[in-house]
Structure formats: structure tokens, C-alpha cells
Design a protein with these regions (language model features):
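Short, mixed-charge low-complexity intrinsically disordered segments
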Residues: 303-364
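Short, extreme N-terminal segment that most often corresponds to the first beta-strand
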Residues: 269-291
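Phosphate/NTP-binding elements of NTP-utilizing enzymes
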Residues: 2-268
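Alpha-helix N-cap recognition
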Residues: 65, 90, 288-290, 306, ...
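Short intrinsically disordered terminal tails
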Residues: 1-2, 269-273, 361-364
Length: 364
């Protein structure tokens, strides 16, 4: 391959960059023979500007591997001294899917711009300019977040796949690397059932909006129902499998919607926490939205409505007016269903088994 300095003097590369640097959608079509869907175009256009920060709900069937391959390939070509770091928390199937599309982009590109092979190559980690610049993949594992540290470049792009499952510590490490004038980050994920964490915050408290001009992230919410890659038959099958179109799973995995429980509870007059003492002498506190969500889910399934609809119409009014109703409902919930949300205020006097069902509960 030619040296790095040569590419910046090559009129063929200069002409390519001049034509496509501000229109990656056109580049995908003319260089890779890929007509991006209207949803994929939104993602590309969101991450295209210098120093862009974008967060996207990516339900099933919007063509995420393909669009991530297009973005990674174009970023590497437009900025040879760049680094694209793709962080993924699951199996290597994610990596293989993206790299397969990178190969497709590469093969189409060589037919249109054969000179490009003088500077770049495609390998197991995607498109590379040299040993240190280009694409790389980092397999995220909880408690081993340091494995994604140490990535620096004049042009740096982090793509976080399944962002809802990445720990806050991992995000802290990512942000510590984003020190250059062009540090971009793209978060993609299906919304998780639990409305906590960095991905959730990127769509709410850290979202850039008219009422939040100090926000960081451009927010994109996509629905598989609007995807040209999804058939009605698939949607019908998914709805049947996951409890109907009003089910929480359908709303998250197809409509790309967050449950909305947290916001509804915070905006209501309902108490926000429950404090309780265990028979072993320990004292605990728990967000009341956990109890409210359990109540709303139970009744929503019986009446064929969404959890959020039942929460707003029945659970919140009930729990606001009658605190004893909260306690009585909490008694029906197994400890294992709520233990992860509880915070210990006072340790137990001994190591007796914790008994949530018989604990004294005080609404605050």
C-alpha cells in the first residue's frame, strides 16, 4: 500500500472526498451500490457531521449491520487517519455481520474507484488504512471494561452496539478516549425493560432538544413497522409470539419505544420510594416505580392494554390515593423479582434469610 502521506496528495482521493464528504447517502449509492432506506439515511446523516453524537433505537429489521458497515467504511475512507471502534456485547455474530457488509462495500468500491486498493485493505476487523488506523472491534464484557480503553486518533468514531447492555463504567472509558476535535459516538440498541443506564439517559436527560439545549445526543427513534425490510407476516408472527401489539416486548423490540414507566411515575404525585424493615433487622429502600410497574403489567395483560396505559389510568391514581394499596400489592411480589432494585440502608443483625413478603413497609 502507498504511504499515509501520499493519499493526501492523490487527486483521485481528493476528488472523491470533495464530492462525498458532505453526502454519505449519495456515497453509499454511487460507491457501494446501496440505496439506504429512509431509516438508515437518518442514522448516516446524524453521525456524518464533525464531532457528532447520536443515539438510535434500533428494533429488529431496520438493517443495522449494513448501515454500520457503510458508516465505518466511509469514515475510514474520508478520514484515513481515523479510528472506528465498534463495541459489541454479544457473540461474534455481530462482528461477522458487519464485516460481511464491509466486504460488499469494498468489492463495489473497487469497481468504481480501483485506485483505493493502493491505500486500504479489508481484513477480519474490516477496512484498515494501516496497522493502527481504520476499523477495529472490541468485545465488551462486564467487569472487563478496560479492554475497550486506549483508542485515540485525530478522527475517532465509537459505535456502541446494543448500548442498553453496556455498563456506565464502559461509557466512562469511552468518553475518556474522546479527546480530539472530531470525536464521534453512535449508540444503537433496542430499549431495555429497565429504564436506567447510559442509553436511557441519552434519550432523555442527555438528549439534545428545544427544551434541553445543553443536551449532547441527537435522538432518533425507529420502528420496525416503518422498515421496508419487514413484512406484515413477520410483524403478525412477532405479535403472536410476544403477547400482542400492546405487549411491552412488542413495543420495545418492534416499535423501538421505551416502557415510559419511569417518566410517568416521576411526573405523578405518587410516592417515589418505599422503605421497609426485614425480620433480620436490616432496613431497605426501593423505588416505588418497581412496585407500580409490577401492578400495571399484571393488570394490563388481563385487559389487553399496554403497561403504560394501565399505569396512568389505574395504578398511579390508586397508589396516589391509597398508600395501603401499595403495601398490599408489594406483599404479593416475590423478593427475587425486586431484590436487584432494593438498596440496603442498615445491615441485618444476623444472617437469617431475608423475608420480603412479611417485611414492614413504610411509604414515603
Amino acid at each position: 500500500m502507498a504511504t499515509k502521506s501520499n493519499i493526501y496528495k492523490d487527486p483521485r482521493w481528493l476528488s472523491l472526498v470533495e464530492k462525498y464528504k458532505d453526502n454519505w447517502v449519495l456515497a453509499a449509492k454511487e460507491l457501494f451500490d446501496i440505496d439506504l432506506s429512509h431509516q438508515q439515511q437518518q442514522i448516516v446523516e446524524a453521525i456524518q457531521p464533525n464531532n457528532a453524537k447520536a443515539t438510535v433505537t434500533t428494533p429488529h429489521g431496520i438493517g443495522r449491520p449494513q448501515v454500520l458497515a457503510v458508516i465505518s467504511t466511509l469514515y475510514t475512507i474520508m478520514y484515513p487517519d481515523s479510528r472506528t471502534v465498534i463495541v459489541y456485547p454479544k457473540s461474534n455474530a455481530c462482528k461477522k455481520g458487519i464485516v460481511a457488509y464491509v466486504w460488499q462495500c469494498w468489492e463495489a468500491l473497487l469497481k468504481k474507484q480501483p485506485f483505493i486498493i493502493e491505500y486500504f485493505k479489508v481484513g477480519d476487523s474490516g477496512l484498515m488504512f494501516n496497522e493502527f488506523l481504520g476499523m477495529c472491534f472490541c468485545n465488551y464484557r462486564l467487569n472487563y471494561e478496560d479492554s475497550i480503553a486506549g483508542h485515540y486518533a485525530d478522527h475517532l468514531l465509537f459505535i456502541i452496539v446494543d448500548s442498553a447492555h453496556i455498563s456506565d463504567r464502559a461509557y466512562s472509558i469511552v468518553w475518556a478516549s474522546m479527546t480530539s476535535g472530531d470525536s464521534r459516538i453512535l449508540l444503537t440498541s433496542i430499549p431495555s425493560p429497565e429504564e436506567i443506564g447510559f442509553f436511557y439517559d441519552s434519550h432523555h436527560g442527555r438528549a439534545l432538544a428545544e427544551d434541553n439545549p445543553s443536551g449532547v445526543y441527537k435522538v432518533i427513534k425507529l420502528s420496525a413497522e416503518d422498515s421496508p425490510f419487514i413484512t406484515q407476516e413477520y410483524l403478525d408472527h412477532f405479535a403472536e409470539r410476544y403477547g400482542g401489539r400492546n405487549s411491552d416486548d412488542y413495543r420495545r423490540m418492534i416499535l423501538g419505544e421505551f416502557p415510559g414507566i419511569r417518566e410517568a411515575v416521576l411526573e405523578s404525585d405518587m410516592p417515589k420510594t418505599m422503605r421497609f424493615s426485614m425480620p433480620d433487622g436490616s432496613e431497605w429502600t426501593m423505588p416505588l416505580r418497581v412496585i407500580a410497574k409490577h401492578h400495571a403489567q399484571h393488570h394490563a395483560k388481563k385487559h389487553g392494554v399496554t403497561t403504560l396505559e394501565w399505569l396512568k389510568s389505574h395504578t398511579i391514581p390508586l397508589f396516589t390515593a391509597d398508600h395501603n394499596a401499595i403495601v398490599e400489592w408489594a406483599k404479593t411480589i416475590p423478593w427475587g423479582n425486586v431484590a436487584e432494585y432494593a438498596h440496603m440502608l442498615k445491615p441485618p443483625k444476623d444472617r437469617q434469610e431475608i423475608s420480603w413478603l412479611t417485611a414492614e413497609k413504610i411509604i414515603e
